């Protein structure tokens, strides 16, 4: 470690725009966090997709794993060898390991940006592309190599058998008579095949003529059918007028049917409503009658109870006085006192009879009202029947004549 190395590292980081400001004094004492952040930044410059994170380093094991991964990535991507022990010290010795990578980055930035178009760079790119092409060809050949080797092995295994058969065939003497027979049979077969081919060609010509004739005949039939179809489309049958007339009549009959159906549905609904209202009136009338009778019964019981209470609760001297008074005035007025009692009883009977008459009159009024409602519903029903008769008359008028 020297002062020059520390100064060069600080200047390079400043020129490369390292996000943290560094000084020479930072490396006088061990500072692992600073070295880890600087190492992460350098690795990200060479490999942007690396997953190193200096902020997750907490323990000694994390430090060791971080240094190992960083050194391995630098070796794989830039062929730069670093000493992990010196990096772990995180002092001036770590600066010596970081300087080679920083120099590469600094030189890459210091180069002229127009050097990409120089002949030297073009030559390098051509060589690189040719090498890449060779690599692709090598990969293809390496994938074909096992298949070729297997095929070659199979052919070599059959070579011995084939060579034996070849030697046996070469050592055998072929008789001329037998060879002549084989050649004659081959010539005859070839002649037969030639004759068959010529016959097929002749048949093809005749078949072509027949097919042309069939095509012409089908065309004529097609044209005739087209003309006939056009005539049938333009022809109007005789029954169409009658059919249209019946169709119109059927529409009218359907309208009448729909009207009758709606009237019938309405009348059924009205009938159901009347029956329901009639039941409700009957129930209300019966309830009112029961309440009136119950009220009369309660009033009568109250009156009877009041009379009995007056009779039982009167004192004996009062009874004697009343009897004496009755005797005195009875002698003077005759039978008027008894007549008054009888008149009171008659009045009570008349009141009961009058209440019964009121209930009967109320019942008669309800019955009269019910009869009027029934007459009104019958009148509505007659109106519906009249409408239905009118619709039936219209139907009979429409259906008169030549109906279907």
From Swiss-Prot:
Keyword annotations of the record: Cell projection, Cilium, Cilium biogenesis/degradation, Coiled coil
Phenotype seen when the gene is deleted: Cilia of at least eight pairs of amphid neurons from mutant dyf(m185) animals are truncated at a middle segment, and empty amphidial sockets were seen indicating cilium structural abnormalities.
Similarity-based family: Belongs to the CLUAP1 family.
Ranges for region Disordered: 328-382
GO cellular component: axon; cell projection; cilium; dendrite; intraciliary transport particle B; microtubule organizing center; neuronal cell body
Transmembrane segments: none
A biological process term (GO) from this entry: cilium assembly
UniProt feature coiled coil, ranges: 176-306
Bias-annotated ranges (Acidic residues): 337-351
Protein name: Clusterin-associated protein 1 homolog
Function of the molecule: Component of the intraflagellar transport (IFT) complex B required for transport of proteins in the motile cilium. May be required for ciliary entrance and transport of specific ciliary cargo proteins such as che-3 which are related to motility. Required for sensory cilia biogenesis.
InterPro entries: Clusterin-associated_protein-1 (IPR019366)
Entry keyword annotation includes Nucleotide-binding: no
Cell location: Cell projection, Axon; Cell projection, Cilium; Cell projection, Dendrite
Domain of life from the UniProt record: Eukaryota
């Amino acid at each position: 470690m020297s002062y020059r190395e520390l100064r060069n590292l600080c200047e390079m980081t400043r020129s490369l725009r390292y996000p943290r400001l560094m000084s020479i004094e930072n490396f006088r004492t061990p500072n692992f966090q600073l070295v880890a952040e600087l190492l992460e930044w350098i690795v990200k410059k060479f490999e942007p997709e690396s997953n190193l994170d200096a902020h997750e380093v907490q323990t000694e094991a994390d430090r060791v794993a971080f240094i190992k991964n960083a050194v391995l990535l630098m070796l794989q991507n830039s062929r730069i060898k670093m000493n992990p022990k010196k990096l772990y010290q995180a002092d001036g010795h770590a600066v010596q390991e970081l300087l080679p990578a920083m120099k590469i980055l600094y030189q890459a930035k210091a180069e002229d940006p127009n050097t990409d178009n120089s002949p030297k760079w073009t030559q390098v790119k051509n060589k690189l592309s040719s090498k890449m092409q060779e690599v692709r060809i090598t990969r293809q050949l390496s994938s074909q190599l096992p298949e070729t080797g297997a095929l070659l092995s199979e052919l070599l295994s059959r070579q011995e058998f084939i060579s034996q058969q070849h030697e046996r065939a070469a050592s055998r003497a072929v008789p001329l008579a037998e060879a002549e027979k084989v050649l004659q049979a081959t010539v005859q077969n070839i002649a037969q095949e030639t004759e068959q081919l010529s016959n097929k060609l002749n048949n093809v010509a005749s078949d072509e003529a027949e097919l042309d004739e069939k095509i012409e005949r089908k065309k004529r039939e097609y044209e005739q059918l087209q003309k006939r179809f056009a005539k049938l489309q333009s022809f109007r049958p005789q029954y169409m007028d009658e059919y249209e007339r019946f169709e119109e009549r059927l529409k009218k009959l359907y309208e009448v049917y729909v009207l009758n159906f709606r009237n019938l549905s309405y009348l059924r609904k009205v009938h159901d409503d009347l029956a329901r209202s009639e039941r409700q009136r009957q129930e209300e009338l019966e309830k009112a009658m029961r309440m009136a009778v119950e009220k009369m019964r309660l009033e009568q019981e109250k009156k009877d109870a009041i009379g009995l209470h007056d009779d039982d609760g009167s004192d004996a001297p009062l009874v004697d006085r009343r009897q004496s008074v009755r005797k005195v005035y009875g002698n003077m007025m005759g039978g008027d006192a008894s007549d008054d009692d009888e008149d009171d009883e008659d009045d009570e009977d008349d009141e009961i009879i009058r209440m019964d008459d009121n209930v009967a009159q109320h019942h008669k009024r309800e019955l009269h009202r019910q009869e009027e409602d029934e007459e009104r519903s019958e009148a509505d029903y007659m109106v519906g029947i009249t409408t239905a008769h009118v619709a039936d008359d219209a139907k009979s008028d429409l259906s008169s004549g030549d109906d279907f």
